Amino acid sequence: MPDSLRPLLRKPFGVLYTGIGSDAVKSLVKDLNNPTKLISVGDVTTFHLLDSNIIPDILIVDDRTKRAPASSQVVFGTKHKGFAEITVDNPPGVITEDLINVISDAIVSDKNVRIFVQGEEDLAALPAILMAPLNSVVLYGQPDEGVMLVRVTESLKAELKDLFDKILEKQDHKEQLLHNVRRKLNGY
């Protein structure tokens, strides 16, 4: 991803719950309010949710944190029985069509789904927010700060579609990818 887009991704799209590990999770629980879907992106965030008996509908992990291997405790802790397991390749700094397809399939599934990303899941929150039903919640970690809680609304989806297009325009095979992604985002 080009450096010019990085500041756009640093903008908070939700509410930051500060704290380390389970402290951040404990503070956000009161604001979950029965979401349509609960989606967790990131190993440490997911670990602390599961450790607090908060079970996401979808979790997206890559066995890494801050671009380094996650601890064995975190890796093991995100492998929760009862989840269908899907593995997808997604290189760092991009959003692949395969990742989008897997997230889309998980959102319409009636099963809990663990998406294991070989590569990097850092950008997975963006398509998750765009494809999730309204009133869903997407949680992702802000390293050394806490957990971001994003409630999915029409206005947020509209705002993020422009950013999403800018990211995809910088990738190879952009025309076909943009066409397929827009189709998915519109429910086809």
Swiss-Prot record:
Transmembrane segments: none annotated. It comes from the Archaea. GTP binds at residues 43-44, 62, 121, 144. It catalyses: 3'-dephospho-CoA + GTP = GDP + CoA + H(+). It is an enzyme of class 2 (transferase). Pfam families: DUF359. Catalyzes the GTP-dependent phosphorylation of the 3'-hydroxyl group of dephosphocoenzyme A to form coenzyme A (CoA). This is GTP-dependent dephospho-CoA kinase.
